[in-house]
Design a protein with these regions (language model features):
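Small-residue-rich helix-interface/hinge motifs
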Residues: 4-110, 114, 360-381
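Residue-level signature of transmembrane alpha-helical entry/exit and packing/kink sites
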Residues: 5, 9-13, 122-130, 346-350
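Terminal peptide-recognition signature
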Residues: 24, 62, 134, 188, ...
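Functional transmembrane alpha-helices
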Residues: 114-122, 169, 250-358, 378-382
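Short extracytoplasmic/periplasmic juxtamembrane "stem" segments immediately C-terminal to an N-terminal membrane anchor
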Residues: 160-187, 194
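Conserved PDZ fold ligand-binding element
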Residues: 183-210
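PDZ-domain C-terminal substructure recognizer with occasional recognition of PDZ-binding tails
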Residues: 194, 200, 214-259
Length: 382
């Protein structure tokens, strides 16, 4: 039964991702038609056609391999300068040959009556809207999905409230991680922190969230820490202690360990609901993380490929494909550690984050990504 749930969760999530990709292409299709660009095809998937139907001049359909989608806008590439619109018979150099090949493919779809309806003939601002329409659609989808999850079910967030105080300093490599015999107490234990304490100030700075508290601890290294907590409704100044330096996962690259301050407490995790402002903050945080991941993406892909060749274990923080995300969704669906509501919320949160990633990835200013065409339109406008 667990296997059936796993497969079902993975398939449903994969279908939702493909629907998102289909809507991404709608984001290109609609403004293209509004601006009069000739659109010959709208397909979800690649390879052999499973189903199609022609409406007007556009053929809509589904293909065998559900690994993406496309909209064919006629005239994406302008003719070579000084030509009559057709391609040269001979090309010199590999890059010119590639460009001429692309122009040749475009010419096959151009008919005598298409003048004025070709993509390259449109104004720069129209090209910009058409090409940005896809990524913007994914951003809208991400916002709607995350707003639904946050507003209806809520999101689990760490609070600036102590859930558990760690008794002693136990190295991660220690053979016995349960005994405190002969080991020093943690700074939190020395300060007299208790479960249920709400942290309201750290070194005189008001604390309003766990993220703020976590950053304060990490950057404090081995310096003095003065904690103020709210205990049983009373404000309590705890004895000052020094945080200690230890190796913790890097905020931006969890696979890397960095030196940071350590206090020795675990925060309370509670489900919180929120509105558009909360979702906007979450999406901005996701955007920062995604942008950092995109910068490191080429190196991560190289390392993953090298590990496949050499047989080394795959980095758990390495690149994840749509199939990999679907597997993760299947694991969430099959687990018995959370209830059904939490599973649905987790799946849609993952779907929202995938949509945001697709949007940001497509904004990368390189062809054949949407960002490459957007960069070209901006260059023309300037």
């Amino acid at each position: 039964m667990e296997l059936v749930i796993y497969i079902g969760g993975a398939v449903i999530f994969f279908a939702l991702v493909m629907a998102s990709i289909g809507l991404h292409e709608v984001g290109h299709l609609v403004p293209a038609k509004i601006f009069g660009v000739k659109v010959t095809q709208y397909f979800v998937g690649f390879g052999r056609t499973l189903w199609s139907r022609r409406i007007g001049e556009t053929q809509y359909g589904v293909k065998l391999l559900p690994l993406g989608g496309y909209v064919r806008l006629v005239g994406m590439f302008p003719p070579a300068p000084g030509s009559d619109g057709r391609v040269r018979r001979y090309s010199t150099g590999p890059f010119r040959a590639m460009a001429d090949s692309a122009r040749a493919a475009e010419w096959e779809n151009i008919e005598p009556g298409d003048d004025g309806r070709l993509f390259y003939q449109k104004k720069s601002w129209q090209k910009l809207i058409i090409m940005a329409g896809g990524p913007i659609m994914n951003i809208v989808l991400a916002a709607v999905i995350l707003l639904g999850v946050t507003g209806i079910y809520g999101v689990l967030r760490a609070q600036p409230v102590v859930s558990r105080v760690q008794e002693c300093m136990i190295p991660a490599t220690a053979p016995d991680t349960t005994s405190c015999a002969g080991r020093p107490a943690t700074p939190a234990k020395l300060a007299g922190m208790r479960a249920g304490d709400r942290i309201i100030a750290f070194n005189g700075v008001t604390i309003s969230s766990w993220d703020q508290m976590s950053t304060a601890i990490r950057t404090n290294l081995d310096h003095r820490a003065q904690l103020t907590v709210l205990r049983d409704g009373h404000r309590v100044e705890l004895p000052p202690v020094n945080t200690v330096v230890t190796g913790v996962p890097d905020k931006w690259d969890p696979g890397k360990r960095v030196a940071a301050g350590f206090l020795g407490l675990e925060p309370l995790v509670a489900r919180e609901r929120g509105g558009p402002v909360v979702v906007a903050k979450d999406m901005w945080h996701m955007t920062e993380q995604t942008a950092y991941a995109l910068v490191r993406f080429p190196a991560k892909v190289y390392r993953t490929a090298a590990n496949l060749i050499t047989g080394k274990p795959r980095d758990q923080y390495g690149p994840m494909s749509i199939v990999g995300a679907s597997r993760a969704a299947g694991e969430v669906a099959a687990t018995d550690r959370i209830d059904v509501g939490a599973k649905i919320a987790a799946l849609f949160t993952l779907l929202g984050s995938v949509n945001l990633f697709v949007a940001l990835f497509n904004f990368v200013p390189l062809l054949p990504l949407d960002g490459g065409h957007i960069a070209g339109a901006l260059y023309e406008a300037v």
